[in-house]
């Protein structure tokens, strides 16, 4: 995939030199990526040119680098609740050091056969993993404040612990949508969504008869509290 947008979820990438290659998003907002799987890339799972990724539930397997920052470009990266396996060169390759825009945060990242967690391209420094299997409770590189009254300084915070067991797969952070053939469109049931018509009765009847109700974009006017039964879902897409 070339040049991502601002949000990506529930996707899988197999093979290729890279799973994702991307430059800055438009209009320069961060990129949120949730519930992704990468396997067998020849160079890196993700190659970023100043994107500013925020990543949750990223499973990477059998590739030299999980995340690579483009040469001579500072970048921001936050990775949380992820699993990296068989990463031969480095979990993260940091391109630029000592730059205010270089920010790296890893939180609760499980690693299996990842001998180098972070490699710094400029200095050649490497942060080694603690064992064959380990958990990164916290890793931070960038400007760090001890408290609000102190000046910031470039620091590296590393809290890694060896573990005896790691998960084989990751569960999903986002709920799985019900099958689309089970959806009922609230507009087909008579809702207007024009900001003026009172759609309360349509919604009340819909939730009493259906479990999965799709609500297209609009301004739906409700004048009473809508009470949902257990398992009833209102589905909106952006």
Where are these regions (language model features)?
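Extracellular "leader-to-stem" segments immediately downstream of a signal peptide or signal-anchor
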Residues: 1, 6-10, 14-15, 22-40, ...
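N-terminal extracellular ligand-recognition/capping segment immediately after the signal peptide
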Residues: 200-238
